[in-house]
Design a protein with these regions (language model features):
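Glycine-rich, highly charged phosphate/nucleotide-binding loops
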Residues: 23-27, 97-102
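Helix-to-loop junction immediately C-terminal to a conserved catalytic motif
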Residues: 14-48
Length: 219
């Protein structure tokens, strides 16, 4: 209850400043299938361009309390910021250890029809790296375990700049449709993880086609 109240407080007080500063434009792969309203349990995945991606998601899906997987480094900045992230429902992922309790926490949330937000790249890309970075398998494992649909999102990662923030929401994916009984669990996890990454890449390509088409129409 506290997280839900705090999340709504942040969204209500932050909506206008965020809208003015970032001017987020939302596109849809198929709005009839998936809009900004999420019904039931779901896992949201996205490419990772900026530390502000987390804030953008709060306002992209305002009607749900998103429980975001966040790297341990963000919780170690200072106690106040750590409290802020936890109050918003942030789940700490310690990438330096072999503690996978975050997967169980995500599963428990999904079992209660909650929404989990994951950045499968697990870190921001460095200059010159091909994006999106390789995905970690925890998303695929959590989706298989919970049978929750995966909603892919692509963002151009532009915040507080002259260039407008733009987002493309894809259609949900049922990862069990990719499960191959002839493969081992490890092979299935690897295959599904790669296909989830391919799905985000397809969104990125579609986004770029739409942007190029607009530029050509202006020319």
């Amino acid at each position: 209850m506290w997280r839900r109240f705090f999340s709504w407080f942040v969204k209500i007080t932050g909506w206008l400043p965020w809208t003015i500063a970032c001017r987020t434009k939302v596109y849809y792969q198929n709005k009839r299938v998936q809009s900004r309203k999420i019904k039931g349990k779901a896992i949201i995945i996205s490419n990772h361009r900026s530390v502000y991606d987390f804030a953008m998601m709060l306002f992209l899906f305002p009607c749900r309390t998103l429980r975001c997987m966040i790297a341990e480094v963000m919780f170690r900045k200072n106690p106040l910021f750590s409290f802020f992230l936890k109050s918003l429902g942030g789940i700490e992922v310690d990438r330096e250890s072999h503690d996978f309790s975050f997967v169980q926490k995500g599963y428990d949330i999904l079992q209660k029809n909650g929404v989990v937000e994951i950045y499968p790249e697990s870190r921001l890309p460095e200059k010159g790296e091909e994006t999106p970075l390789p995905f970690k398998p925890s998303t695929a494992y959590m989706a298989l375990l919970s049978q929750a649909p995966v909603i892919p999102v692509f963002t151009n990662g532009c915040y507080f700049k002259k260039k407008r923030n733009k987002v493309l929401i894809g259609t949900p994916v049922n990862v069990w449709e990719w499960y191959d009984e002839t493969l081992s669990e490890k092979e299935n996890l690897e295959n599904i993880t790669n296909r989830l990454r391919d799905t985000v890449i397809e969104l990125q390509n579609e986004f770029e086609r739409r942007e190029n088409k607009k530029e050509n129409e202006k020319a």
